[in-house]
Amino acid sequence: MSGIFQYIKQTASAAKDYNILDFFPLRKSLAGYQRDFKGHLSGDTRAGVNVALLAFPQGMAYALIAGLPIEYGIYGSAVAAMVAPIFAKSHYITLGPTNATSVMLLSAFASLGIAGPQMLSLVPLLILMVGLFVVIGAYFKVANFVQYISRSVITGYITAAALLIIANQLPKALGLSLPRKGATFYDSLTLISSHIDTLHWTTVGISLATMALYILLNRCCKTLPNVAICLIAISASSALFLGPTANVALLSGINAADWSLQLPSLAWSDIQLLASPALAIALLCILEGISIGKSLAAKTGARLNANQAMISIGMANIG
């Protein structure tokens, strides 16, 4: 046992200089703009447009997965993209909502028996607590110990999350109007099978067309923003050829004027209620962000400062 503690101590000591946290690394990136303003601006603009075209529809999808209005996903992606780079040293960190965190957020509120307006009022506090936990973890160098978590644990959770996403989104793809009961994978499939005779075939056709177009584009045009292309092409085709008589369910509109900046409720009872889910989601954010970042960095031979990456992830949630 003493050998394990000695190894951990030596590893932490060797990484000490490398893992010094920088709370404003953006200044180094801005220094590059002074040397070649046009070149940096042109490249970053193209990259920003491409990422935005991908993040916009994905943000909406993640919001639906989490049981939230679609604007939550859009705003979350936008704020994360604006706040996190101020604290990030690496180009390999992915930010914003993800499949796994969206499922965990939905599951957390479902396990607490919270839904509707109460859920919407508590989401900002939950995300704030997640961000604080991640930043505190970065200060205590938690990322140094993430490597000891088994890859099979992460893979198993992500696989289970993917199955739950499929089960929860199938009713929308099939045009079924179901009561929101199925909290588990089995319950969701049972509920769908009991209403299979009420399929809305126009919605099924749109879903299949979207899947076919996405698979085709992924095979022949991998460099294009295929998610955005599918969203625009299928939506335009449906509006042009089907019209309102098709009775296809539509998303509600987004009114930007309704978005106001305000602090979340900081009631102690709410903080106690959300502490455990926030800690679990924070751990998942750390695992996802660092594992993806390390994989991307390894492809170019770069090295990821995992604790600095945690600062950017945490501040994105706080923002």
Name each region found by the language model.
Residues 2-319:
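Transmembrane helical cores of multi-pass ion-transport proteins
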